[in-house]
């Protein structure tokens, strides 16, 4: 069996930043306890379980305000996906200590929304309903933000102003966003469009579109709640023409998928620990369809290898530099 190790894959800088911020919090004796994360720090249960092992507890729910109702004391960490101003205000009113791990790329989009609101624009935001990033985007300016996910959502819009700004969730498929932006342009010809697919998401999608071509299947390692993971599987099917299966870890890999395969492509979502991908690759490298002793799939639960290994004392400055870079037109 030939294994195509699609590159780049796995952790992006926004995920690493958020995890380092949370790890640093666990090491800070001055922070009020308990320490909770408002939702999943990144969409991967292996990561949230690893943080729980060092006293950083995930509290999840339908939306950020509902989750916050469950937290009464201590410190709360806002996840990489971002939160609305009302959630931040509510946390402050409850007397909670807060730490913001929002990805700089997401913050940049939220800042754009605020700028366009101040300039008198209606904002069409392309995103996945129920995902925390669009929840935060909508909550940034609820009077002017209109969340759309499909062409039917766009058809249902009734905007009287010609001042329309269009942007999107950072982890969407760039092709889906382009298609919806084209559709919006037909209905609102004067709309200003600003695609906000983050570079880490974009290069991972492009890698799958090119490198998965010709494979018998693509295995995408990532949590079922990870939107960017789902988009990688979609890209494999729609752009590379290769069927794809998403697995949370090696234990979910079905032998039926691979026993007759000659070429298997492997990639991973931006919130997937390297350890989980390595287990899949090691399994495939030793797999022999004719030898059932090679079929055993076991995940080694090693939280220490999932969590970041060191504090980064320059994290805040690097995040400021990233935000400034994006504001100046960088990608």
From Swiss-Prot:
GO biological process: dimethylallyl diphosphate biosynthetic process; isopentenyl diphosphate biosynthetic process, methylerythritol 4-phosphate pathway; terpenoid biosynthetic process
Binding residues for [4Fe-4S] cluster: 12, 103, 198
Pfam families found in the cross-reference section: LYTB (PF02401)
Amino acids binding isopentenyl diphosphate: 43, 81, 131, 226, 228, 271
Domain of life from the UniProt record: Bacteria
Sorted UniProt keywords: 4Fe-4S, Iron, Iron-sulfur, Isoprene biosynthesis, Metal-binding, Oxidoreductase
Binding site for dimethylallyl diphosphate: 43, 81, 131, 226, 228, 271
Cofactor note: Binds 1 [4Fe-4S] cluster per subunit.
Residues annotated as signal peptide: none
Coiled coil residues, start to end: none
Name the UniProt record assigns to this protein: 4-hydroxy-3-methylbut-2-enyl diphosphate reductase
Its EC number(s): 1.17.7.4
Pathway the protein takes part in: Isoprenoid biosynthesis; dimethylallyl diphosphate biosynthesis; dimethylallyl diphosphate from (2E)-4-hydroxy-3-methylbutenyl diphosphate: step 1/1; Isoprenoid biosynthesis; isopentenyl diphosphate biosynthesis via DXP pathway; isopentenyl diphosphate from 1-deoxy-D-xylulose 5-phosphate: step 6/6
Binding positions ((2E)-4-hydroxy-3-methylbut-2-enyl diphosphate): 43, 81, 131, 170, 226, 228, 271
Entry annotation: catalytic residues: 133 (proton donor)
Cofactor dependency: [4Fe-4S] cluster
PANTHER family per UniProt: 4-HYDROXY-3-METHYLBUT-2-ENYL DIPHOSPHATE REDUCTASE (PTHR30426:SF0)
Gene Ontology molecular functions: 4 iron, 4 sulfur cluster binding; 4-hydroxy-3-methylbut-2-enyl diphosphate reductase activity; metal ion binding
């Amino acid at each position: 069996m030939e294994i195509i190790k699609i590159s780049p894959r796995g952790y992006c800088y926004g995920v690493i930043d958020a995890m380092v911020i949370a790890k640093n919090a666990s090491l800070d004796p001055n922070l009020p306890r308990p320490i909770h994360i408002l939702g999943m720090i990144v969409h991967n249960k292996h990561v949230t379980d690893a943080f729980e092992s060092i006293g950083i507890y995930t509290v999840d729910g339908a939306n950020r305000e509902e989750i916050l109702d469950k937290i009464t004391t201590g410190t709360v960490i806002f996840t990489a996906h971002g939160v609305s101003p009302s959630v931040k205000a509510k946390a402050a009113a409850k007397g909670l200590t807060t730490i913001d791990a929002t990805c700089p790329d997401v913050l940049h989009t939220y800042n754009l929304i605020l700028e366009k609101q101040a300039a008198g624009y209606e904002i069409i935001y392309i995103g996945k309903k129920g995902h925390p990033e669009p929840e935060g985007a909508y909550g940034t300016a609820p009077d002017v933000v209109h969340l759309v996910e499909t062409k039917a959502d766009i058809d249902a819009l009734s905007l009287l102003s010609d001042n329309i700004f269009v942007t999107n969730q950072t982890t969407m498929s760039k092709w889906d966003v382009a298609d919806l932006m084209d559709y919006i342009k037909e209905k609102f010809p004067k709309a200003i469009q600003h695609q906000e697919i983050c570079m880490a998401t974009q290069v991972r999608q492009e890698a799958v579109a090119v490198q998965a071509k010709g494979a018998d299947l693509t295995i995408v390692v990532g949590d079922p709640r990870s939107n960017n993971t789902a988009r990688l599987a979609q890209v494999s099917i729609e752009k590379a023409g290769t069927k794809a299966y998403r697995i949370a870890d090696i234990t979910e890999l079905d032998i039926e998928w691979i026993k007759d395969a000659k070429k298997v492509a492997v990639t991973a979502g931006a919130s997937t620990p390297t350890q989980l991908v390595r287990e899949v690759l090691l399994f495939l490298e030793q797999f022999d369809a004719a030898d059932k002793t090679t079929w055993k799939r076991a995940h080694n639960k090693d939280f220490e290898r999932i969590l970041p290994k060191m504090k980064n004392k320059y994290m805040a400055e690097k995040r400021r530099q990233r935000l400034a870079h994006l504001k100046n037109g960088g990608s």
